[in-house]
């Protein structure tokens, strides 16, 4: 039997990038051979084994044939006659269809090295169209390799468009869409993922709420980029640039969904877009089964981001209630995530990317002030329900003093 390193590890090795995961394909072996050598079977749909010592994945070389719709609609065939070339041709992109043997010799039957050199993302064969998840995977690779100058081959983008138009994307499960999208959101250029999906016509099928933002105008004095969709992707790029968490990136992505629902007669103003956004954000999160914590921050940012922009003019009581809704006393990290998302929104505007956002520091200081006031600070004779009422009173008074000090400093 022959063992080859395949896929992403070989691709990244040839690019000179670091890699963690190693996947191997085994040619000329049977499940019985693998078990006899101590490998542990883990594959449900096809024979995949874990190495007894390294726990790395070893898959028997296989072919596959489309038998139904969607990601799971395949029949797999594996035996000792399946060659390395047979296994590699079923892979998505030529740059992922390269193998390396244990002596370091490269096997590249489909031109992957040439495409690496020319910075091209190209499908291996027409079988690419049999798996709709590959549309999302290619979009994610476009995001990952964007800084290195990679582009999708025109014929591959055309095939992705055909797949999007065919309705095959509807067969993808919410879990698969979210898994691929959450991985894409953590790329350094996550905006390219969504732009690529839009370019191939997949965005309107998978994320209609986001697709609807493109072409919707905003007031140019506040948004020089004008287009709501462009603003959304610019804001997302700010979150990526700052290396923020998945929760923050997703919240930034959906913060303005309400603008797509603004009545035409009100454009380019978007009064009450925060309230209008609650329904589409909720729908998107429920459809994709977005984790609860991620959904909660997204809804908070959607509902409250204008208050963060206007924070210095908020009345102390209004600011306290905002902090309360963000669960400032139990979850200060959520307030921080909220501030980060709002700052990305403010900086996701053409020509304003580097403008200071003093509201962020103001919010952080306000958070520290209310968190510093404890029960021990109250008079000893306060009992029962009065304790909670007086804590609120003390916190609002402290915020009022903070606001006055801030205004005095800014006017001095």
From Swiss-Prot:
Cofactor binding mode and count: Magnesium is required for nucleotidyltransferase activity.
CDD domains: HDc, NT_ClassII-CCAase
Positions bound to ATP: 8, 11, 91, 137, 140
GO molecular function terms noted in the UniProt entry: ATP binding; CCA tRNA nucleotidyltransferase activity; cyclic-nucleotide phosphodiesterase activity; magnesium ion binding; phosphatase activity; tRNA binding
E.C. number(s) listed in UniProt: 2.7.7.72, 3.1.3.-, 3.1.4.-
Other observations noted: A single active site specifically recognizes both ATP and CTP and is responsible for their addition.
Domain notes: Comprises two domains: an N-terminal domain containing the nucleotidyltransferase activity and a C-terminal HD domain associated with both phosphodiesterase and phosphatase activities.
Protein name (database record): Multifunctional CCA protein
Species name: Acinetobacter baumannii (strain SDF)
Designated gene of the protein: cca
């Amino acid at each position: 039997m022959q063992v080859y390193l395949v896929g992403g590890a070989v691709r990244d090795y040839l690019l000179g990038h670091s890699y963690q995961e190693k996947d191997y394909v085994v040619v000329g072996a049977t499940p019985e051979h693998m078990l006899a050598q101590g490998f542990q079977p883990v594959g449900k749909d096809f024979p995949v084994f874990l190495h007894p010592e390294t726990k790395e994945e070893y898959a028997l070389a296989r072919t596959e044939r489309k038998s139904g719709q969607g990601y799971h609609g395949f029949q797999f065939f594996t035996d000792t006659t399946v060659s390395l070339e047979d296994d590699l041709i079923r892979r998505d992109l030529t740059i992922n269809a390269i193998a390396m043997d244990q002596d370091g010799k490269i096997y590249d039957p489909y031109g992957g090295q040439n495409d690496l050199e020319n910075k091209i993302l190209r499908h291996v064969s027409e079988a690419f169209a049999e798996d709709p998840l590959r549309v999302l995977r290619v979009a994610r690779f476009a995001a990952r390799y964007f800084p290195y100058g990679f582009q999708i081959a025109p014929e591959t983008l055309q095939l992705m468009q055909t797949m999007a138009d065919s309705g095959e994307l509807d067969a993808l499960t919410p879990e698969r869409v979210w898994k691929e999208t959450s991985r894409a959101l953590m790329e350094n250029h996550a905006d390219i993922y969504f732009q690529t999906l839009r370019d191939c016509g997949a965005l309107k099928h998978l994320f209609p709420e986001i697709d609807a933002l493109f072409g919707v105008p905003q007031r140019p004095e506040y948004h020089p980029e004008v287009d709501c969709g462009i603003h959304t992707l610019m804001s997302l790029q700010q979150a990526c640039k700052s290396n923020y968490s998945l929760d923050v990136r997703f919240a930034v992505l959906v913060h303005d969904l309400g603008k797509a629902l603004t009545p035409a007669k009100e454009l380019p103003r978007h009064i009450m877009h925060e309230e209008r956004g609650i329904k589409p954000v909720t729908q998107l999160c429920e459809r994709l089964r977005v984790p609860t914590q991620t959904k909660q921050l997204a809804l908070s940012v959607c509902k409250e981001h204008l208050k963060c922009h206007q924070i210095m003019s908020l009345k102390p009581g209004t600011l306290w209630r905002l902090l309360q809704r963000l669960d400032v006393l139990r979850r200060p990290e959520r307030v921080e995530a909220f501030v980060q998302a709002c700052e990305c929104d403010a900086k996701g505007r053409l020509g304003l990317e580097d403008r200071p956002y003093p509201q962020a520091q103001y919010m952080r200081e306000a958070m520290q002030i209310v968190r510093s006031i404890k029960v021990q600070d109250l008079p000893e004779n306060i009992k029962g329900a009065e304790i909670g009422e007086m804590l609120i009173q003390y916190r609002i008074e402290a915020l009022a003093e903070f606001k006055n000090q801030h205004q005095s400093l800014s006017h001095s």
